């Protein structure tokens, strides 16, 4: 059933792309040129997808993207990945190996996918000592958190509905967290760090709020290990996903940015070095689906 629906969506998207690709490419090129021309003076610049923007602009632009896609975010994840994102997230939480007594910060937690898996994993583990656990779901976009909280209520995964586990939802910037030093035993961020302006600051803040022995884990789109497969994946990403976003969510530009941000993100080894530079030890990564995504892990020792 899922395969049939996904195939139908892909077919519709491919037909739709022929009516939009040429004009959209022209608009993107114009936007990139005008964006570059408008940047003057000494203010630092960064990338927003393939565009060059002022650092002060990127946060607002990313915020606007997720405001636009919040209500359709989970549906689009299923459509874009043909449902495989569910498997990636399951593996991610299994690699974390939640235990009772853990204090987790789920950064860029948005609509709650990682947190809900964490809570269900805990529920399946015996807890004879009744050790209390906690998770803080944090995101820079309040709209995404609102969607997540409503999902939690429907799924029966709120503090009132759980035993020996509390859940908090808090809007926060990953680059300047409002939490005390050494306040969490684990930090997760899934498909969020590439949207941040200063990845080094995000990693530094993650290190700060973790307790000694705490674990940092990141699930993020990455780069395929085979050049031919990377080319095929790029064709799918750029030719299918934006029109699919238009068909299902009425958002071409938002999903154009998302695929561009994936291509701009550092390769696995480079990101591994960035995690090490933030102070983490025993840093490693694991490729899933030939490197479409990678799980990065490090410890604060």
Curated annotation (Swiss-Prot):
Sites where the protein binds S-adenosyl-L-methionine: 111, 139, 173-174
A Pfam family of this chain: Ubie_methyltran
Cystine residue pairs: none
Polar residues: bias regions: 20-31
Alphabetized UniProt keyword annotations: Membrane, Methyltransferase, Mitochondrion, Mitochondrion inner membrane, S-adenosyl-L-methionine, Transferase, Transit peptide, Ubiquinone biosynthesis
Annotated Gene Ontology cellular component terms: extrinsic component of mitochondrial inner membrane; mitochondrion; ubiquinone biosynthesis complex
Pathway assignment: Cofactor biosynthesis; ubiquinone biosynthesis
Subcellular location: Mitochondrion inner membrane
Residue span of region Disordered: 20-44
The reaction(s) this protein catalyses: a 2-methoxy-6-(all-trans-polyprenyl)benzene-1,4-diol + S-adenosyl-L-methionine = a 5-methoxy-2-methyl-3-(all-trans-polyprenyl)benzene-1,4-diol + S-adenosyl-L-homocysteine + H(+)
Entry coiled-coil feature ranges: none
GO biological process: methylation; ubiquinone biosynthetic process
Membrane topology: Peripheral membrane protein
EC number: 2.1.1.201
Presence of keyword Membrane: yes
Enzyme type, top EC level: transferase
A GO MF label: 2-methoxy-6-polyprenyl-1,4-benzoquinol methyltransferase activity
Keyword S-adenosyl-L-methionine in annotation: yes
Alphabetical list of InterPro entries matching this protein: SAM-dependent_MTases_sf, UbiE/COQ5_MeTrFase, UbiE/COQ5_MeTrFase_CS
Protein task: Methyltransferase required for the conversion of 2-polyprenyl-6-methoxy-1,4-benzoquinol (DDMQH2) to 2-polyprenyl-3-methyl-6-methoxy-1,4-benzoquinol (DMQH2).
HAMAP family per UniProt: MenG_UbiE_methyltr (MF_01813)
Record's subunit section: Component of a multi-subunit COQ enzyme complex.
Family: Belongs to the class I-like SAM-binding methyltransferase superfamily. MenG/UbiE family.
Protein name according to UniProt: 2-methoxy-6-polyprenyl-1,4-benzoquinol methylase, mitochondrial
Source organism of the structure: Drosophila melanogaster (Fruit fly)
Organism ancestry: Eukaryota, Metazoa, Ecdysozoa, Arthropoda, Hexapoda
């Amino acid at each position: 059933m899922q395969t049939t629906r996904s195939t139908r969506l892909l077919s519709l998207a491919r037909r739709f792309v022929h009516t939009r690709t040429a004009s959209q490419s022209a608009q993107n090129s114009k936007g990139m040129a005008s964006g570059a021309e408008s940047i003057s003076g000494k203010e630092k610049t960064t990338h927003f997808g393939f565009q060059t923007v002022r650092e002060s602009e990127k946060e607002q632009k990313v915020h606007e993207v997720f405001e636009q896609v919040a209500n359709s975010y989970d549906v689009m994840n299923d459509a874009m990945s043909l449902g495989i994102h569910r498997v990636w997230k399951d593996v991610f939480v299994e690699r974390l190996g939640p235990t009772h007594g853990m204090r987790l910060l789920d950064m860029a937690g948005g609509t709650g996918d990682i947190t809900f898996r964490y809570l269900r994993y805990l529920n399946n583990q015996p807890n004879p000592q009744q050790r209390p656990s906690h998770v803080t779901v944090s995101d820079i976009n309040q709209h995404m958190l609102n969607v997540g909280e409503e999902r939690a209520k429907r799924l029966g995964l709120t503090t009132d509905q759980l035993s020996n586990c509390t859940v908090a939802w808090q809007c926060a910037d990953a680059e300047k967290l409002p939490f005390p030093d050494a306040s969490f035993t684990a930090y997760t961020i899934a498909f969020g760090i590439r949207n941040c302006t200063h990845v080094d600051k995000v990693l530094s803040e993650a290190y700060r709020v973790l307790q000694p022995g705490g674990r940092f884990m990141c699930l993020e789109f990455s780069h395929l290990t085979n050049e031919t497969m990377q080319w095929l994946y790029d064709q799918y990403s750029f030719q299918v996903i934006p029109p699919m976003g238009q068909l299902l969510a009425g958002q071409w530009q938002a999903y154009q940015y998302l695929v561009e941000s994936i291509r701009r993100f550092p390769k696995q080894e480079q990101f591994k070095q960035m995690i090490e530079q933030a102070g983490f030890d025993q840093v490693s990564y694991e490729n899933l689906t030939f490197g479409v995504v990678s799980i990065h892990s490090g410890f604060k020792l």
